[in-house]
Protein backbone atom coordinates (compact mmCIF):
# COMPACT_ATOMS: atom_id res chain seq x y z
CA UNK A 1 0.00 0.00 0.00
CA UNK A 2 1.43 3.36 -1.01
CA UNK A 3 1.70 5.84 1.84
CA UNK A 4 1.98 9.58 2.31
CA UNK A 5 5.34 11.22 1.85
CA UNK A 6 6.66 14.72 1.05
CA UNK A 7 6.33 15.57 -2.64
CA UNK A 8 8.13 18.33 -4.50
CA UNK A 9 8.43 18.95 -8.22
CA UNK A 10 11.85 18.65 -9.83
CA UNK A 11 13.58 21.85 -10.94
CA UNK A 12 15.97 22.53 -13.78
CA UNK A 13 16.34 20.91 -17.20
CA UNK A 14 16.99 17.27 -16.34
CA UNK A 15 14.02 15.20 -17.46
CA UNK A 16 12.47 12.31 -15.57
CA UNK A 17 9.92 11.73 -18.33
CA UNK A 18 10.59 11.27 -22.04
CA UNK A 19 9.82 14.83 -23.16
CA UNK A 20 8.72 18.18 -21.83
CA UNK A 21 5.15 17.33 -22.89
CA UNK A 22 5.08 14.60 -20.25
CA UNK A 23 7.55 16.13 -17.80
CA UNK A 24 5.30 19.19 -17.49
CA UNK A 25 2.17 17.42 -16.18
CA UNK A 26 4.40 15.30 -13.93
CA UNK A 27 5.98 18.36 -12.32
CA UNK A 28 2.67 20.20 -12.00
CA UNK A 29 1.02 17.20 -10.35
CA UNK A 30 3.90 17.07 -7.90
CA UNK A 31 3.79 20.84 -7.44
CA UNK A 32 0.13 20.65 -6.44
CA UNK A 33 1.21 18.48 -3.50
CA UNK A 34 4.25 20.51 -2.46
CA UNK A 35 3.87 21.35 1.27
CA UNK A 36 4.31 25.02 0.32
CA UNK A 37 1.28 24.72 -1.97
CA UNK A 38 -1.19 22.10 -0.72
CA UNK A 39 -3.47 22.58 2.27
CA UNK A 40 -3.23 18.93 3.45
CA UNK A 41 -0.62 17.21 1.28
CA UNK A 42 -0.56 13.98 3.31
CA UNK A 43 -4.22 13.51 2.37
CA UNK A 44 -3.56 14.62 -1.24
CA UNK A 45 -5.84 17.63 -0.57
CA UNK A 46 -4.67 20.72 -2.42
CA UNK A 47 -7.31 23.34 -1.55
CA UNK A 48 -11.04 23.97 -1.21
CA UNK A 49 -11.82 21.68 1.70
CA UNK A 50 -11.37 18.33 -0.04
CA UNK A 51 -10.06 19.18 -3.53
CA UNK A 52 -7.49 16.48 -4.38
CA UNK A 53 -4.72 15.99 -6.93
CA UNK A 54 -5.03 12.17 -7.01
CA UNK A 55 -7.54 9.68 -5.64
CA UNK A 56 -5.12 7.97 -3.28
CA UNK A 57 -1.39 7.43 -2.95
CA UNK A 58 -1.48 4.25 -5.04
CA UNK A 59 -3.13 6.22 -7.84
CA UNK A 60 -0.59 9.02 -7.45
CA UNK A 61 2.27 6.56 -7.82
CA UNK A 62 0.62 4.94 -10.83
CA UNK A 63 0.14 8.32 -12.53
CA UNK A 64 3.80 9.16 -11.94
CA UNK A 65 4.91 5.82 -13.41
CA UNK A 66 2.78 6.29 -16.51
CA UNK A 67 3.91 9.88 -17.10
CA UNK A 68 7.57 8.88 -16.93
CA UNK A 69 7.13 6.31 -19.72
CA UNK A 70 4.46 8.01 -21.84
CA UNK A 71 5.38 8.73 -25.47
CA UNK A 72 4.47 11.83 -27.44
CA UNK A 73 1.94 9.88 -29.49
CA UNK A 74 0.13 8.50 -26.44
CA UNK A 75 -2.55 9.87 -24.12
CA UNK A 76 -3.03 8.98 -20.46
CA UNK A 77 -6.64 8.82 -19.23
CA UNK A 78 -7.32 9.83 -15.62
CA UNK A 79 -10.74 9.15 -14.09
CA UNK A 80 -11.33 11.00 -10.81
CA UNK A 81 -7.68 10.92 -9.86
CA UNK A 82 -6.91 7.36 -10.99
CA UNK A 83 -5.07 6.41 -14.21
CA UNK A 84 -7.30 4.03 -16.14
CA UNK A 85 -5.74 3.72 -19.59
CA UNK A 86 -3.09 4.75 -22.11
CA UNK A 87 -4.15 5.10 -25.75
CA UNK A 88 -2.19 5.60 -28.95
CA UNK A 89 -3.13 9.03 -30.34
CA UNK A 90 -0.84 11.55 -32.09
CA UNK A 91 1.51 14.43 -31.29
CA UNK A 92 -1.24 17.06 -31.48
CA UNK A 93 -3.44 15.20 -28.99
CA UNK A 94 -3.27 15.97 -25.26
CA UNK A 95 -0.81 13.87 -23.32
CA UNK A 96 -3.33 13.64 -20.47
CA UNK A 97 -7.14 13.77 -20.42
CA UNK A 98 -8.73 14.10 -16.98
CA UNK A 99 -12.36 13.79 -15.85
CA UNK A 100 -13.01 14.47 -12.18
CA UNK A 101 -16.08 14.21 -9.93
CA UNK A 102 -18.61 13.93 -12.77
CA UNK A 103 -22.00 12.46 -11.86
CA UNK A 104 -25.24 12.03 -13.81
CA UNK A 105 -27.86 14.68 -12.97
CA UNK A 106 -30.15 12.90 -10.50
CA UNK A 107 -27.10 11.45 -8.72
CA UNK A 108 -25.12 14.71 -8.66
CA UNK A 109 -25.28 15.40 -4.94
CA UNK A 110 -22.98 15.21 -1.93
CA UNK A 111 -24.43 12.02 -0.34
CA UNK A 112 -24.01 10.03 -3.56
CA UNK A 113 -20.54 11.46 -4.15
CA UNK A 114 -19.51 10.56 -0.60
CA UNK A 115 -20.83 7.02 -1.05
CA UNK A 116 -18.73 6.57 -4.17
CA UNK A 117 -15.74 8.30 -2.59
CA UNK A 118 -15.92 5.93 0.39
CA UNK A 119 -15.88 3.00 -2.04
CA UNK A 120 -12.68 4.38 -3.59
CA UNK A 121 -14.39 5.11 -6.92
CA UNK A 122 -14.15 8.91 -7.09
CA UNK A 123 -12.46 12.00 -5.74
CA UNK A 124 -13.38 15.68 -5.59
CA UNK A 125 -11.13 17.58 -7.99
CA UNK A 126 -12.27 21.14 -7.21
CA UNK A 127 -11.06 23.20 -10.20
CA UNK A 128 -7.25 23.30 -10.34
CA UNK A 129 -6.51 20.60 -7.74
CA UNK A 130 -7.45 17.62 -9.88
CA UNK A 131 -6.30 19.33 -13.08
CA UNK A 132 -2.74 19.96 -11.80
CA UNK A 133 -2.47 23.72 -12.33
CA UNK A 134 -2.93 25.12 -8.82
CA UNK A 135 -0.25 27.72 -8.05
CA UNK A 136 -1.12 28.53 -4.46
CA UNK A 137 -3.13 31.47 -3.24
CA UNK A 138 -1.79 33.66 -6.06
CA UNK A 139 -4.06 31.65 -8.36
CA UNK A 140 -7.14 33.48 -7.11
CA UNK A 141 -5.38 36.70 -6.12
CA UNK A 142 -5.80 38.70 -9.29
CA UNK A 143 -9.46 37.75 -9.68
CA UNK A 144 -10.04 38.90 -6.11
CA UNK A 145 -7.95 42.02 -6.75
CA UNK A 146 -9.96 42.79 -9.91
CA UNK A 147 -13.21 42.35 -8.00
CA UNK A 148 -12.18 44.77 -5.27
CA UNK A 149 -10.82 47.17 -7.89
CA UNK A 150 -14.23 47.12 -9.60
CA UNK A 151 -15.92 47.82 -6.25
CA UNK A 152 -13.49 50.68 -5.66
CA UNK A 153 -14.18 52.15 -9.09
CA UNK A 154 -17.95 51.85 -8.80
CA UNK A 155 -18.46 52.90 -5.20
CA UNK A 156 -15.38 54.54 -3.69
CA UNK A 157 -13.79 56.79 -6.29
CA UNK A 158 -11.26 54.28 -7.63
CA UNK A 159 -9.53 53.35 -4.37
CA UNK A 160 -10.36 51.43 -1.21
CA UNK A 161 -8.28 53.83 0.91
CA UNK A 162 -10.28 54.72 4.00
CA UNK A 163 -12.59 51.71 3.71
CA UNK A 164 -13.04 48.58 5.82
CA UNK A 165 -13.77 45.19 4.28
CA UNK A 166 -15.11 42.45 6.56
CA UNK A 167 -14.88 38.90 5.28
CA UNK A 168 -14.11 35.34 6.37
CA UNK A 169 -12.04 32.40 5.21
CA UNK A 170 -8.26 32.15 4.84
CA UNK A 171 -7.95 28.84 3.03
CA UNK A 172 -6.28 28.33 -0.33
CA UNK A 173 -8.80 30.60 -2.06
CA UNK A 174 -9.91 32.94 0.72
CA UNK A 175 -6.31 33.59 1.70
CA UNK A 176 -6.03 35.99 -1.24
CA UNK A 177 -8.61 38.37 0.19
CA UNK A 178 -6.52 40.44 2.61
CA UNK A 179 -3.75 41.08 0.07
CA UNK A 180 -6.29 41.87 -2.67
CA UNK A 181 -7.82 44.50 -0.37
CA UNK A 182 -4.50 46.04 0.65
CA UNK A 183 -3.31 46.11 -2.97
CA UNK A 184 -6.34 48.34 -3.50
CA UNK A 185 -5.23 50.49 -0.51
CA UNK A 186 -7.99 49.26 1.82
CA UNK A 187 -8.29 47.65 5.26
CA UNK A 188 -9.38 44.03 5.68
CA UNK A 189 -10.66 42.33 8.82
CA UNK A 190 -10.85 38.59 8.16
CA UNK A 191 -12.43 35.90 10.34
CA UNK A 192 -10.79 32.46 10.28
CA UNK A 193 -11.58 29.49 12.52
CA UNK A 194 -8.23 27.72 12.03
CA UNK A 195 -5.20 29.52 13.54
CA UNK A 196 -2.79 27.49 11.41
CA UNK A 197 -4.36 28.80 8.20
CA UNK A 198 -4.23 32.39 9.41
CA UNK A 199 -0.57 32.18 10.40
CA UNK A 200 0.24 30.51 7.08
CA UNK A 201 -1.15 33.56 5.24
CA UNK A 202 1.09 35.81 7.35
CA UNK A 203 4.08 33.62 6.49
CA UNK A 204 3.35 33.88 2.75
CA UNK A 205 2.79 37.64 2.85
CA UNK A 206 -0.96 37.66 2.18
CA UNK A 207 -1.94 38.89 5.66
CA UNK A 208 -0.30 41.48 7.89
CA UNK A 209 -1.05 39.96 11.30
CA UNK A 210 -3.31 37.84 13.48
CA UNK A 211 -4.98 39.74 16.33
CA UNK A 212 -5.05 38.50 19.92
CA UNK A 213 -8.83 38.84 19.96
CA UNK A 214 -11.81 40.62 18.45
CA UNK A 215 -11.35 43.83 20.43
CA UNK A 216 -7.78 44.22 19.20
CA UNK A 217 -8.75 43.37 15.62
CA UNK A 218 -11.47 46.02 15.59
CA UNK A 219 -9.22 48.62 17.19
CA UNK A 220 -6.38 48.07 14.72
CA UNK A 221 -8.65 47.89 11.68
CA UNK A 222 -10.54 51.05 12.57
CA UNK A 223 -7.29 52.92 13.28
CA UNK A 224 -5.88 51.95 9.87
CA UNK A 225 -9.14 52.95 8.20
CA UNK A 226 -9.04 56.38 9.87
CA UNK A 227 -5.43 56.82 8.70
CA UNK A 228 -6.31 55.64 5.17
CA UNK A 229 -3.52 53.08 5.56
CA UNK A 230 -3.57 49.71 3.79
CA UNK A 231 -3.70 46.99 6.44
CA UNK A 232 -5.05 43.49 7.04
CA UNK A 233 -5.75 41.62 10.24
CA UNK A 234 -7.29 38.25 11.05
CA UNK A 235 -9.29 37.29 14.11
CA UNK A 236 -9.65 33.65 15.10
CA UNK A 237 -13.28 32.67 15.47
CA UNK A 238 -16.40 31.37 13.77
CA UNK A 239 -17.81 33.69 11.10
CA UNK A 240 -21.37 32.77 12.10
CA UNK A 241 -20.62 34.18 15.55
CA UNK A 242 -18.17 36.99 14.80
CA UNK A 243 -20.07 38.73 11.96
CA UNK A 244 -23.29 39.05 13.99
CA UNK A 245 -21.20 40.39 16.88
CA UNK A 246 -19.52 42.98 14.64
CA UNK A 247 -22.96 44.04 13.43
CA UNK A 248 -24.28 44.22 17.00
CA UNK A 249 -21.35 46.42 18.03
CA UNK A 250 -22.08 48.82 15.20
CA UNK A 251 -18.76 48.33 13.40
CA UNK A 252 -19.05 50.32 10.18
CA UNK A 253 -18.15 48.06 7.28
CA UNK A 254 -17.88 49.48 3.79
CA UNK A 255 -17.63 46.09 2.03
CA UNK A 256 -18.66 42.63 3.21
CA UNK A 257 -18.07 39.31 1.44
CA UNK A 258 -17.00 35.76 2.27
CA UNK A 259 -14.75 32.92 1.12
CA UNK A 260 -15.30 30.16 3.64
CA UNK A 261 -15.60 26.60 2.29
CA UNK A 262 -19.39 26.76 2.19
CA UNK A 263 -19.65 24.78 -1.06
CA UNK A 264 -19.52 21.58 1.02
CA UNK A 265 -21.36 21.80 4.37
CA UNK A 266 -18.86 19.32 5.84
CA UNK A 267 -16.13 21.90 5.16
CA UNK A 268 -17.89 24.66 7.14
CA UNK A 269 -17.43 24.64 10.92
CA UNK A 270 -20.82 24.92 12.69
CA UNK A 271 -21.37 27.02 15.77
CA UNK A 272 -20.64 25.10 18.94
CA UNK A 273 -18.27 22.60 17.33
CA UNK A 274 -14.62 22.74 18.35
CA UNK A 275 -11.95 22.79 15.66
CA UNK A 276 -10.35 19.59 16.95
CA UNK A 277 -13.71 17.74 16.80
CA UNK A 278 -14.57 18.88 13.28
CA UNK A 279 -13.23 16.02 11.15
CA UNK A 280 -14.43 13.22 13.41
CA UNK A 281 -17.93 14.69 13.81
CA UNK A 282 -18.31 15.35 10.06
CA UNK A 283 -17.26 11.82 9.14
CA UNK A 284 -19.37 10.02 11.75
CA UNK A 285 -22.58 12.08 11.56
CA UNK A 286 -22.55 13.85 8.17
CA UNK A 287 -26.29 14.54 8.02
CA UNK A 288 -26.44 16.05 11.50
CA UNK A 289 -23.26 18.02 10.83
CA UNK A 290 -24.70 19.31 7.54
CA UNK A 291 -27.87 20.56 9.25
CA UNK A 292 -25.86 22.38 11.91
CA UNK A 293 -23.50 23.86 9.31
CA UNK A 294 -26.42 25.16 7.26
CA UNK A 295 -28.03 26.70 10.32
CA UNK A 296 -24.74 28.47 11.04
CA UNK A 297 -24.48 29.64 7.43
CA UNK A 298 -27.96 31.13 7.73
CA UNK A 299 -26.79 33.21 10.70
CA UNK A 300 -23.67 34.17 8.75
CA UNK A 301 -25.69 35.33 5.73
CA UNK A 302 -28.24 37.09 7.92
CA UNK A 303 -25.42 39.20 9.34
CA UNK A 304 -24.16 39.99 5.83
CA UNK A 305 -27.65 41.14 4.84
CA UNK A 306 -27.67 43.25 8.01
CA UNK A 307 -24.49 44.98 6.88
CA UNK A 308 -26.06 45.53 3.46
CA UNK A 309 -29.11 47.11 5.09
CA UNK A 310 -26.72 49.38 6.99
CA UNK A 311 -25.20 50.61 3.70
CA UNK A 312 -22.28 48.28 3.02
CA UNK A 313 -21.45 46.93 -0.44
CA UNK A 314 -22.12 43.20 -0.01
CA UNK A 315 -21.48 40.44 -2.54
CA UNK A 316 -21.16 36.66 -2.67
CA UNK A 317 -17.83 35.24 -3.84
CA UNK A 318 -19.25 32.12 -5.40
CA UNK A 319 -18.90 29.57 -2.61
CA UNK A 320 -22.61 28.62 -2.32
CA UNK A 321 -23.01 30.34 1.05
CA UNK A 322 -26.29 31.91 -0.08
CA UNK A 323 -27.65 28.64 -1.42
CA UNK A 324 -26.84 26.75 1.77
CA UNK A 325 -28.40 29.51 3.90
CA UNK A 326 -31.52 29.33 1.77
CA UNK A 327 -31.69 25.56 2.31
CA UNK A 328 -31.62 26.31 6.05
CA UNK A 329 -34.72 28.47 5.61
CA UNK A 330 -33.28 31.98 5.49
CA UNK A 331 -35.52 33.88 3.08
CA UNK A 332 -33.24 36.82 2.19
CA UNK A 333 -30.18 34.77 1.24
CA UNK A 334 -30.15 36.03 -2.35
CA UNK A 335 -30.78 39.70 -1.53
CA UNK A 336 -27.17 40.49 -2.42
CA UNK A 337 -25.52 39.56 -5.75
CA UNK A 338 -22.71 37.27 -6.75
CA UNK A 339 -19.40 38.87 -7.72
CA UNK A 340 -19.46 37.77 -11.37
CA UNK A 341 -22.69 39.50 -12.45
CA UNK A 342 -21.89 42.44 -10.20
CA UNK A 343 -18.31 43.13 -11.29
CA UNK A 344 -16.59 40.55 -13.53
CA UNK A 345 -18.90 39.76 -16.44
CA UNK A 346 -17.76 42.73 -18.56
CA UNK A 347 -14.26 41.22 -18.48
CA UNK A 348 -15.63 37.83 -19.52
CA UNK A 349 -17.27 39.49 -22.54
CA UNK A 350 -13.76 40.42 -23.73
CA UNK A 351 -12.48 36.87 -23.28
CA UNK A 352 -10.56 37.91 -20.16
CA UNK A 353 -9.92 35.54 -17.32
CA UNK A 354 -7.32 34.03 -14.96
CA UNK A 355 -4.55 33.13 -17.39
CA UNK A 356 -1.47 31.79 -15.57
CA UNK A 357 1.94 30.30 -16.18
CA UNK A 358 4.55 28.46 -14.13
CA UNK A 359 8.31 28.15 -14.60
CA UNK A 360 9.40 24.51 -14.74
CA UNK A 361 12.97 25.66 -14.08
CA UNK A 362 11.98 26.58 -10.54
CA UNK A 363 13.92 29.84 -10.94
CA UNK A 364 12.06 33.03 -9.92
CA UNK A 365 14.21 34.90 -12.46
CA UNK A 366 12.23 33.21 -15.22
CA UNK A 367 9.00 34.72 -13.91
CA UNK A 368 10.67 38.11 -13.59
CA UNK A 369 11.64 37.81 -17.25
CA UNK A 370 8.07 36.96 -18.24
CA UNK A 371 6.80 39.92 -16.23
CA UNK A 372 9.05 42.17 -18.30
CA UNK A 373 7.77 40.54 -21.48
CA UNK A 374 4.16 41.18 -20.45
CA UNK A 375 4.95 44.83 -19.78
CA UNK A 376 6.65 45.04 -23.17
CA UNK A 377 3.63 43.51 -24.92
CA UNK A 378 0.84 45.23 -23.00
CA UNK A 379 2.49 48.14 -21.21
CA UNK A 380 -0.07 50.58 -22.63
CA UNK A 381 -2.70 48.92 -20.45
CA UNK A 382 -2.16 50.87 -17.23
CA UNK A 383 -4.38 48.61 -15.14
CA UNK A 384 -2.59 45.44 -16.26
CA UNK A 385 0.84 47.05 -15.85
CA UNK A 386 -0.06 48.07 -12.30
CA UNK A 387 -1.05 44.49 -11.51
CA UNK A 388 2.21 43.05 -12.85
CA UNK A 389 4.27 45.54 -10.85
CA UNK A 390 2.28 44.94 -7.65
CA UNK A 391 2.49 41.17 -8.10
CA UNK A 392 6.24 41.39 -8.58
CA UNK A 393 6.57 43.41 -5.38
CA UNK A 394 4.09 41.68 -3.10
CA UNK A 395 3.45 38.08 -4.18
CA UNK A 396 5.47 35.29 -2.60
CA UNK A 397 5.76 32.15 -4.69
CA UNK A 398 4.48 28.82 -3.37
CA UNK A 399 6.15 25.84 -5.02
CA UNK A 400 7.23 26.43 -8.62
CA UNK A 401 7.40 30.17 -9.40
CA UNK A 402 4.29 31.29 -11.25
CA UNK A 403 2.32 34.32 -12.31
CA UNK A 404 -1.37 34.99 -12.87
CA UNK A 405 -2.45 37.71 -15.26
CA UNK A 406 -5.95 38.30 -16.62
CA UNK A 407 -5.51 38.49 -20.39
CA UNK A 408 -8.26 38.43 -23.00
CA UNK A 409 -8.99 37.33 -26.53
CA UNK A 410 -6.20 38.48 -28.84
CA UNK A 411 -3.75 38.79 -25.93
CA UNK A 412 -3.16 35.33 -24.46
CA UNK A 413 -1.71 33.86 -27.65
CA UNK A 414 0.68 36.81 -28.01
CA UNK A 415 2.00 36.12 -24.51
CA UNK A 416 2.30 32.41 -25.27
CA UNK A 417 4.23 32.96 -28.47
CA UNK A 418 6.60 35.44 -26.81
CA UNK A 419 7.24 33.05 -23.94
CA UNK A 420 7.92 30.21 -26.36
CA UNK A 421 10.47 32.39 -28.17
CA UNK A 422 12.13 33.15 -24.82
CA UNK A 423 12.47 29.42 -24.11
CA UNK A 424 13.91 28.82 -27.58
CA UNK A 425 16.47 31.62 -27.22
CA UNK A 426 17.59 30.55 -23.76
CA UNK A 427 16.30 33.72 -22.11
CA UNK A 428 14.22 31.36 -19.96
CA UNK A 429 16.13 28.49 -18.37
CA UNK A 430 13.44 25.86 -19.00
CA UNK A 431 9.96 25.56 -20.51
CA UNK A 432 6.82 27.10 -19.06
CA UNK A 433 3.33 25.71 -18.67
CA UNK A 434 0.48 28.05 -19.61
CA UNK A 435 -2.99 27.37 -18.24
CA UNK A 436 -5.78 28.98 -16.29
CA UNK A 437 -8.35 28.51 -13.58
CA UNK A 438 -11.57 26.78 -14.60
CA UNK A 439 -13.22 30.01 -13.42
CA UNK A 440 -12.90 31.53 -16.88
CA UNK A 441 -15.01 33.31 -19.43
CA UNK A 442 -16.12 30.36 -21.55
CA UNK A 443 -15.30 27.19 -19.64
CA UNK A 444 -17.90 26.87 -16.89
CA UNK A 445 -21.59 26.49 -16.19
CA UNK A 446 -22.28 27.55 -12.61
CA UNK A 447 -25.59 29.30 -11.85
CA UNK A 448 -24.41 30.39 -8.39
CA UNK A 449 -21.16 31.90 -9.68
CA UNK A 450 -19.73 32.34 -13.19
CA UNK A 451 -23.05 32.06 -15.05
CA UNK A 452 -25.33 33.60 -12.43
CA UNK A 453 -27.91 35.94 -13.93
CA UNK A 454 -27.04 35.47 -17.61
CA UNK A 455 -28.87 37.96 -19.81
CA UNK A 456 -30.77 35.26 -21.70
CA UNK A 457 -31.49 33.04 -18.69
CA UNK A 458 -28.99 30.38 -19.79
CA UNK A 459 -27.33 30.10 -16.37
CA UNK A 460 -27.57 26.30 -16.12
CA UNK A 461 -26.81 25.31 -19.71
CA UNK A 462 -23.82 22.97 -19.44
CA UNK A 463 -22.98 22.56 -23.14
CA UNK A 464 -20.38 25.32 -22.94
CA UNK A 465 -17.78 23.65 -20.68
CA UNK A 466 -18.14 20.47 -22.72
CA UNK A 467 -17.51 22.41 -25.93
CA UNK A 468 -14.58 24.15 -24.26
CA UNK A 469 -12.92 20.85 -23.35
CA UNK A 470 -13.48 19.53 -26.87
CA UNK A 471 -12.10 22.72 -28.44
CA UNK A 472 -8.94 22.63 -26.35
CA UNK A 473 -8.45 18.93 -27.10
CA UNK A 474 -8.80 19.69 -30.82
CA UNK A 475 -6.48 22.71 -30.62
CA UNK A 476 -3.40 21.03 -29.17
CA UNK A 477 -3.48 21.56 -25.40
CA UNK A 478 -1.03 19.39 -23.46
CA UNK A 479 -3.60 18.32 -20.90
CA UNK A 480 -7.34 18.94 -20.74
CA UNK A 481 -9.73 18.42 -17.82
CA UNK A 482 -13.48 18.29 -17.33
CA UNK A 483 -14.80 18.55 -13.77
CA UNK A 484 -18.03 18.77 -11.81
CA UNK A 485 -18.82 20.61 -8.59
CA UNK A 486 -15.81 22.90 -8.28
CA UNK A 487 -16.21 26.10 -6.30
CA UNK A 488 -19.89 25.69 -5.46
CA UNK A 489 -20.33 21.98 -4.79
CA UNK A 490 -21.98 18.88 -6.19
CA UNK A 491 -24.82 19.42 -8.64
CA UNK A 492 -24.04 23.10 -9.08
CA UNK A 493 -21.29 23.41 -11.70
CA UNK A 494 -19.51 21.83 -14.67
CA UNK A 495 -16.19 23.26 -15.82
CA UNK A 496 -13.19 22.58 -18.03
CA UNK A 497 -9.50 23.46 -18.04
CA UNK A 498 -6.43 23.31 -20.25
CA UNK A 499 -2.67 23.56 -19.84
CA UNK A 500 -0.22 23.90 -22.73
CA UNK A 501 3.57 23.62 -22.68
CA UNK A 502 5.87 26.27 -24.15
CA UNK A 503 9.06 24.29 -24.80
CA UNK A 504 10.57 26.52 -27.47
CA UNK A 505 9.74 24.29 -30.43
CA UNK A 506 7.91 25.23 -33.61
CA UNK A 507 5.25 22.65 -32.80
CA UNK A 508 4.65 24.25 -29.41
CA UNK A 509 4.25 27.64 -31.09
CA UNK A 510 1.54 26.27 -33.37
CA UNK A 511 -0.28 24.66 -30.47
CA UNK A 512 -0.01 27.75 -28.28
CA UNK A 513 -1.39 30.02 -30.99
CA UNK A 514 -4.42 27.80 -31.51
CA UNK A 515 -5.17 26.98 -27.88
CA UNK A 516 -4.64 30.49 -26.56
CA UNK A 517 -6.82 31.93 -29.32
CA UNK A 518 -9.62 29.38 -29.23
CA UNK A 519 -9.85 28.98 -25.45
CA UNK A 520 -10.67 32.65 -24.69
CA UNK A 521 -12.58 32.77 -27.96
CA UNK A 522 -15.06 30.40 -26.35
CA UNK A 523 -15.71 33.08 -23.74
CA UNK A 524 -16.50 35.68 -26.37
CA UNK A 525 -18.75 33.23 -28.24
CA UNK A 526 -20.55 32.22 -25.02
CA UNK A 527 -21.38 35.82 -24.19
CA UNK A 528 -22.33 36.76 -27.75
CA UNK A 529 -24.79 33.88 -27.68
CA UNK A 530 -26.20 35.13 -24.37
CA UNK A 531 -26.87 38.56 -25.87
CA UNK A 532 -24.14 40.77 -24.40
CA UNK A 533 -23.44 43.84 -26.54
CA UNK A 534 -19.83 44.13 -25.40
CA UNK A 535 -19.14 40.55 -26.48
CA UNK A 536 -20.67 41.28 -29.90
CA UNK A 537 -18.40 44.33 -30.21
CA UNK A 538 -15.32 42.29 -29.28
CA UNK A 539 -16.23 39.54 -31.73
CA UNK A 540 -16.67 42.07 -34.52
CA UNK A 541 -13.54 44.09 -33.69
CA UNK A 542 -11.24 41.08 -33.20
CA UNK A 543 -12.55 38.71 -35.84
CA UNK A 544 -14.26 36.01 -33.79
CA UNK A 545 -16.47 34.10 -36.23
CA UNK A 546 -19.99 33.74 -34.86
CA UNK A 547 -22.66 32.53 -37.31
CA UNK A 548 -25.37 35.13 -37.78
CA UNK A 549 -23.38 37.98 -36.24
CA UNK A 550 -23.67 40.99 -38.54
Swiss-Prot record:
InterPro entries xref list: Urocanase (IPR055351), Urocanase-like (IPR023637), Urocanase_C (IPR035401), Urocanase_central_sf (IPR038364), Urocanase_CS (IPR023636), Urocanase_N (IPR035400), Urocanase_Rossmann-like (IPR035085), Urocanase_sf (IPR036190)
Reactions performed catalytically: 4-imidazolone-5-propanoate = trans-urocanate + H2O
Keyword ATP-binding attributed: no
Homology family: Belongs to the urocanase family.
Active site residues according to the UniProt entry: 405
Segments crossing the lipid bilayer: none
Compartments in which it is found: Cytoplasm
GO MF annotation list: urocanate hydratase activity
Protein's job: Catalyzes the conversion of urocanate to 4-imidazolone-5-propionate.
EC annotation from Swiss-Prot or TrEMBL: 4.2.1.49
EC primary class: lyase
Ranges in coiled-coil conformation: none
Pfam families hit by this protein: Urocanase, Urocanase_C, Urocanase_N
Name of the protein in its database record: Urocanate hydratase
UniProt xrefs under SUPFAM superfamilies: Urocanase
Pathway: Amino-acid degradation; L-histidine degradation into L-glutamate; N-formimidoyl-L-glutamate from L-histidine: step 2/3
Annotated organism of origin: Saccharopolyspora erythraea (strain ATCC 11635 / DSM 40517 / JCM 4748 / NBRC 13426 / NCIMB 8594 / NRRL 2338)
Binding of NAD(+), residues: 48-49, 126, 172-174, 192, 197, 238-239, 259-263, 268-269, 317, 487
Keywords carried by this UniProt record: Cytoplasm, Histidine metabolism, Lyase, NAD
One Gene Ontology term from the biological process aspect of the record: L-histidine catabolic process to glutamate and formamide
Cofactor note: Binds 1 NAD(+) per subunit.
Amino acid sequence: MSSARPVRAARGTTLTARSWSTEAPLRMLQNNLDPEVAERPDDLVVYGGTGKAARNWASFDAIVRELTTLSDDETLLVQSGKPVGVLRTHEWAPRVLLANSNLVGDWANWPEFRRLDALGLMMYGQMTAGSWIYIGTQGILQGTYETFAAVAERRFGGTLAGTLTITAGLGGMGGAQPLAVTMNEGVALVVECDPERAHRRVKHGYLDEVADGLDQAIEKAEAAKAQRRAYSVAVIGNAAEVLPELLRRGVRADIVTDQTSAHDPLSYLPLGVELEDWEDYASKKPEEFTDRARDSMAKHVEAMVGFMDAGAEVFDYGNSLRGEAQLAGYGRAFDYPGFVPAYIRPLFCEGKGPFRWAALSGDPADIAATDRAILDLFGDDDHLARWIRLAGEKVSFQGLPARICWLGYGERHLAGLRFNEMVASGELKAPLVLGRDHLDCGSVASPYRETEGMADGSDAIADWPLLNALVNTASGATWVSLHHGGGVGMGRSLHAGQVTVADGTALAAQKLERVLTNDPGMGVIRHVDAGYDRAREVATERGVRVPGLA
